[in-house]
Amino acid sequence: MISVVIPTYNEAAVIEETLRRACRALEASSEPFELIVVDDSSTDGTAELAESLAPQFPVRVLRRPGRLGLATAVVDGWKLACGDLLAVMDADLQHPPEVLGELVRALRAPGADVAVASRYMSGGGTSDWSLVRRFASKSATHLAASVLPWTLGNVSDPMSGMFAVRAATLDGVRLDPTGYKILLEVLAKARYRALVEVPYVFDRRGAGSSKLGGRQSFEYLVHLARLAGATGQLAAWVRYLAVGLSGATIDLVTLYLAAGRLGWPLLAAAPAAIELALVSNFFLNESLTFRSCHASEHEIGSRESEVGSRGLLSRFLHYEKACVLGALLNALVTVALTKSGIRLLTAAAAGVVAGGAWNFLFNIPNIWRVWGAPTPVSRSISKCSAS
């Protein structure tokens, strides 16, 4: 059975069409299904209208006092669900209900445990977003991937509000989300092995206005911090930053000795100092930051035999590849500023900051992926082509 939770707040203008289109999409699956509307005290009669539609559609309505938030609405709705597949979508028609059928088909295929509707894969997109909104969405997505690189991996749209999951993956899992991004909570805590993404185009709002504001943005940041702590990634981040500071020190000291004391040409001294720092960072991360990775995922099956020198060499080469652009930016900034008359160590410090900023803004998931994630579940991600 398929259970779809639809959180609502003042969606009376579109709720009937949403339910009708959702039913049409799910009827094509030839499986029993239910729709659960979770309403946070709408003032426009959304809950009453949804209840009046029960003779037409298999819908139940859960009324909650006050505005308690979208993510907790999903959790409360799932608690009432009878299905072995649990799904969620918005009521405002920005999530095309027809995509529900694609999510169900993806989960009924062998092996998939989570199916995410993605705006950011081939075949997906947004209908009429402004440049500012696109930038804000991409920035929030990238921030999540940087703060939770183990959790999100290669998921293209971890901020998606439309997805489906096997109920069994949530058995015994305590979902305690903050704000409105329930998918982050599910990806961090669900016991799933494989995730599949389905493309969709985020549509225009059918009616009403956006519920997103400053409070929701703050709750999103709090949620990220909580999940980072709960999954061990916050502690790993502290170790990673400490290692990075040690590498910056090695870079600056080596450059000062090589170029300032030994007279090496700057074009030779800067790359040598950066490479020495990278080597130090790799081995410190290997032994301190990501040590737990080698005792879990990396030892599943035949992986255990690779933890020796061959596995170490492979990780080192992947690390060098992941860091090459940040290292190049570091060297370019250092050389350019020094040639313009800025003192060597000041220029080198600016280079370190530039390279570090590049890695944080664009490269953290790639770097952390060198070691994988310390989890007993090996997760895979695949893409469904647009149909």
Q: What is each PLM-predicted segment?
A:
Residues 1, 150-153, 175-252, 285-318, ...:
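Hydrophobic helical membrane-anchoring modules
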Residues 11-26:
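Short, well-formed alpha-helical segments that are part of the catalytic scaffolds
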Residues 11-14, 42, 96:
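Donor nucleotide-sugar binding loop of glycosyltransferases
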Residues 64-80, 85, 94-180, 205-210, ...:
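Acceptor/aglycone-binding surface of glycosyltransferases and processive sugar-polymer synthases
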Residues 71, 141, 184, 243-247, ...:
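Alpha-helical transmembrane segments of multi-pass integral membrane proteins
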